[in-house]
Amino acid sequence: GDTVKFGMPMAASMTLLAWGANEYREGYERSGQLDEAMDAIKWGTDYLLKAHVTKGGKTEAFYGQVGLGDVDHAYFGRVEDMQVERPAFKIDAQNPGTDLAAEASAALASAAILFRRSNPGYANKLLTNAKQLYTFADRYRDRYSNSITDAAKFYKSWDGYEDELAWAETWLYKATGQKKYLTKAEANYDGVGWTQSWGDKNFGTSILLAQARPNRKKYQRDAEQWLNNWADGAGGVQYTPGGFAWMSEWGSARMAATASFLAGVYSDTVQDPQGKYAEFAESQIDYLLGDNPNQFSYMVGFGDKYAKQPHHRNATGTPDFNTPANNRHILFGALVGGPTAPNDNAYRDVRSDYVANEVALDYNAGFTGALARMYDKFGGEALSDAQLTMLPGISVPESSL
């Protein structure tokens, strides 16, 4: 339940959020959520722009963390009442962070595509900063957690930085159309990794390259190897009797949701002749929303039976996270960690079990795109402003009612 500003998962979340809005813009529009999505993304990209220090048109530094993980974790209360040390940490030429700078570049480039239509001036600003960050990332190379050592305890760069370089290059190609970025992306692309996450971008890149290079089957093979693992229950993925694709104790719902988003994108934009990847994508989102043996929704505030104790300090409303009472505030829309083992009953709605109940930016990033796809494909009825206002803790300005 911390409030440390960890730059790596934050930037990775913005990239995925923007990708979802780019791919399924109509789904966001039809559900009445495009403005909200763009506001959320701009909140994140505005922060990344502020964290980016330039001089003479070049990156001088990028602030990749604010706060100390252990100190922040020791406090569980309202953020407005925090009285703890919150130092800022940066990467620069002497203390590089290739993966962090490249991920920030990818986020800004992905968002630039999204804002191009409605706010071209802002899109240009995003793209200029994305190019500067990429040049810096490519020139000064090292894992960011070697420079920002406090981050190594929580978001360590385990698999190097080549995947982030290829990821950024592919997004820059999509944002600019300049072949030089595509050429570099193909050179840096390293093939199959673990799974798409804040720290591993191989599979997202394989799908982007499969879109860009339809005649080069390697990217399709790599993407489908990963997607088949998820759809078939192989390569570390295990299925519960109720149909949940489980991969890891930490954030199992997040991993399945992100895989679902990418499976949907691949099915819709590359190929899926048997409908296998679309079926996987939809089945996992259905499971997370309550179509499971326990009829339990892992999305807070959705359905009749949902997670009531997400591990989130402000939502809890008390400094004692061991209190048995449900959270004082409903954290609408948050996706909790999910089952901690490949078992439909391996989840406890207990705040102190932070492995199962933690919430995070990257937990919702791919999930949101997957939901937009579902709305785009199957439709639905969005809540009216009047209905939203009736929800506890939700307020809609009168001018919009």
Predicted region positions:
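N-terminal carbohydrate-binding/catalytic regions of secreted carbohydrate-active enzymes
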Residues: 1-11, 117, 123-127, 131, ...
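Acidic, Ser/Thr-rich low-complexity linear motifs
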Residues: 146-157, 196, 239-249, 301
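Helix-capping and short linker residues that terminate individual alpha-solenoid repeat units
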Residues: 25, 53, 116, 138, ...
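Carboxylate/His-rich catalytic cores and anion/metal-binding grooves
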Residues: 40-57
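Short coil/linker segments at helix-helix boundaries
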Residues: 19-43, 84-92, 110-127
